[in-house]
A protein has these predicted regions:
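Active-site gating loops and adjacent loop-to-helix segments of metal-dependent hydrolytic enzymes
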Residues: 1-40
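C-terminal functional module detector
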Residues: 10, 35-41, 46-188
Length: 188
């Protein structure tokens, strides 16, 4: 199974690693730097690639890497959080990562639930029925968050100002009348 580095080692604490000769990535497939300019272009490019995989029906669990010791990131700067209900051990952690019960961050800790379920849950609806999924979040952060975005099938479906979320922890509902995916991201 493929596991994708969504928070990859190009993302450093105060800057994004890039090749000054090309204005793009230091390695890997280059992005269109005119459409996705430095400094946030790499993050948007990484997300676009990930969204294309999800839109193709691939269930690619998110992961992260900091390249500590190679780049100036502290250990664990880009990190993956894995939801483990059962015994916490190496085998269970890897099993849950592979199942997609994870999220990545290099900032806030997002404890999101969809209809009370953690990340990675697969919802099923009867044929021809619309599925309405309530979303909630507990967010712990030392960073200033401007807004929270709900991304559905690669497009921003909702933007919630952080101040609005603080009132009750609700992110509203997301609806599906066909197969798809969604994610929650905090914008710092």
């Amino acid at each position: 199974r493929i596991i994708s580095g969504i928070a990859n080692n190009h993302m450093c604490r105060d800057w994004v690693y890039f090749n000054p000769l090309t204005g793009g990535e230091a390695w890997g497939r280059p992005r269109d730097v005119k459409r996705l300019p430095h400094p946030h272009g790499n993050a948007h490019w990484t997300q676009e690639i990930y969204y294309h995989a999800l839109n193709a029906g691939l269930r690619v669990p998110p992961s992260a890497g900091s390249a500590s010791g190679v780049l100036p990131n502290p250990l664990g700067y880009n990190r993956v959080w894995v939801h483990v209900d059962e015994t916490f051990d190496r085998e269970t952690w890897w099993k849950n990562l592979k199942a997609g019960r994870s999220f990545v961050s290099n900032g806030p800790l997002l404890r999101c639930e969809a209809s009370g379920k953690p990340p990675g849950h697969v919802f099923k609806a009867a044929n021809g029925k619309t599925l309405n999924i309530p979303l909630t979040a507990k967010i712990f952060t030392g960073d200033e968050i401007s807004e929270i975005e709900i991304v559905k099938n690669g497009q921003i479906a909702a933007t919630i100002p952080f101040e609005n979320w603080k009132k009750n922890g609700s992110l509203g509902k997301i609806s599906f009348n066909e197969s798809g995916w969604f994610l929650v991201r905090a914008i710092t």
